[in-house]
Amino acid sequence: MTDLKPLKIAIASGKGGTGKTTLSTNLAAFIAEQNEVVLVDLDVEEPNSGLFFKGELTHEEDIFKMIPQWDESKCTLCGICPKLCSYHAVIQLGPSIIVFPELCHSCYACSELCPVDALPMIPKKTGALRDFRVGKLHFVESRLEIGEEQAVQLISKTKKYVDDNYGKVSIAIFDSPPGTSCPVMEATRDADFVILVTEPTPFGLHDLSLAVETMRALQKPFGVVVNRYGIGNDEVIHYCREENIPLLAKIPNSRKIAELYSSGKLTYQDFPEVKQSLSDILDYCITTVKGGAA
């Protein structure tokens, strides 16, 4: 059954605004011209891949996490639960136990180890998942509830939904959150290959180096795509050479590409060089994963 699992390609970046979603949406649409593909927007705090596709909604569901609810009638104020919680989601304040849902990681320790069952777990909505279809392209996005602070659980449950429903799709594209924090690690953790998108500027190079450190710590095979090539210098190119990082493509800086993007349109159909870059990127990912290269 292993060979039925999709090739998972995560597209990430050290900072926002580098073109991560541009690459994700265009690569997914390019693949969908020939094969079934699922594009998953894991930037759950600000998903926007859906702006580029007008698809049929095929599934929608709310996502919940479990949090403890204090039962005052059972509680003996023994003080065990605050000591158990590493995240300080449960505290004792005088004659009361206070639960902070936004800090809770749903580990169940306080509930399971309470000697009088005074902290039963209850569901709390953290976001919503939607699944669309556009021809051979399936698009899944999750959106974090306003006021929620933890994206990791929602990202994890979104990936599980994809595993449960798209195990036979040949390729899955994960549009990851920007940066190098916990949500990025969760989004890329199961990826077979990670594409890091950067821009040829000092700021882009700085954040790329942080993303490279993260991927190496996770022991993920990865390569770099330089977007808006031509706006700055070649320091990013030199960095990739010095660090022996595969440079997968250089997408040119273009006013026309920016205009298409701002109108919610894909760009590869109008730019043969971009379409060729997408083909090269895909070939490299497939060859690297199948060949077992790091």
Residue ranges and their predicted role:
Residues T2, V212-A294:
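C-terminal lobe/tail of nucleotide-utilizing enzymes
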Residues T2-A32:
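Walker A (P-loop) phosphate-binding motif
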Residues L27-E33, K54-L77, H88-S106:
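Ferredoxin-like iron-sulfur electron-transfer modules
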Residues N35-G50, P123-A128:
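Short beta-strand-centered segment that lines the nucleotide-binding/catalytic pocket of NTP-utilizing
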Residues L42-D43, E141-Q150, K157-V184:
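Switch II (G3) loop of P-loop NTPases
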Residues V44-E46, G179, T201-F203, Y229-G232, ...:
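Conserved nucleotide-binding/hydrolysis micro-motifs of P-loop NTPases
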Residues I80-I98, A109-K125:
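Iron-sulfur cluster-binding cysteine motifs and their immediate structural context
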Residues S181-P202, L208:
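Inter-motif core of Ras-like GTPase G domains
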